[in-house]
Amino acid sequence: MSGWADERGGEGDGRIYVGNLPTDVREKDLEDLFYKYGRIREIELKNRHGLVPFAFVRFEDPRDAEDAIYGRNGYDYGQCRLRVEFPRTYGGRGGWPRGGRNGPPTRRSDFRVLVSGLPPSGSWQDLKDHMREAGDVCYADVQKDGVGMVEYLRKEDMEYALRKLDDTKFRSHEGETSYIRVYPERSTSYGYSRSRSGSRGRDSPYQSRGSPHYFSPFRPY
């Protein structure tokens, strides 16, 4: 068996993932949702314009995190049904495993999408953060010309990404923004090749759309 272990990464440190939140959610709302399960150490809310917000909530006692998942997963909150679970991590220490010191995660999956239109400063970490709104990302990579690849642990998460994250606003760690396109791997012949099958798909219908426009707070393009 490889060094990968599909663990419930937050179980040991009291952290849980909360997804499918309403767009106007605040940290105070999350505190109100979870305070009864135990003392909360930290709330990290990810609320990007145009995307469904998600959050990480960390309890002082890991057992409280288990209770919160049991009590709030599938809970109807306004018009939203919450998704509450342990965040998945690998290798036993949390975080995302990497192919090299600064490389992308190395676990692979067949539930794969390609992304085009990334800004020049967009990294695989930025791509992973953006795309995990659809579910658990096990691999993310960025190549030249603003093209990236993302693999999900579950088929339904891949399908959700294709429906909901296509033509959404992406922001890099340097503040550059662009609108990205998300499409199935089979629809493209960008730089990625399928080494397991040795074949490539047809040309992407997005190749004819022209160069994407980037918006940078640092330099003009």
Curated annotation (Swiss-Prot):
UniProt-recorded Gene Ontology molecular function terms: protein domain specific binding; RNA binding
UniProt record similarity statement: Belongs to the splicing factor SR family.
Cited InterPro entries: Nucleotide-bd_a/b_plait_sf, RBD_domain_sf, RRM_dom, RRT5_SRSF_SR, SRSF9_RRM1, SRSF9_RRM2
Protein's cellular compartments: Nucleus
Top-rank lineage group of the source organism: Eukaryota
Record cross-link Glycyl lysine isopeptide (Lys-Gly) (interchain with G-Cter in SUMO2), residues: K36
Originating organism: Homo sapiens (Human)
Tissue: Expressed at high levels in the heart, kidney, pancreas and placenta, and at lower levels in the brain, liver, lung and skeletal muscle.
Domain RRM: 14-89, 111-187
Name of the protein in its database record: Serine/arginine-rich splicing factor 9
Protein role: Plays a role in constitutive splicing and can modulate the selection of alternative splice sites. Represses the splicing of MAPT/Tau exon 10.
Residue numbers bearing the Phosphotyrosine modification: Y192, Y214
Positions of the UniProt region annotated as Disordered: 189-221
Low complexity biased stretches: 189-198
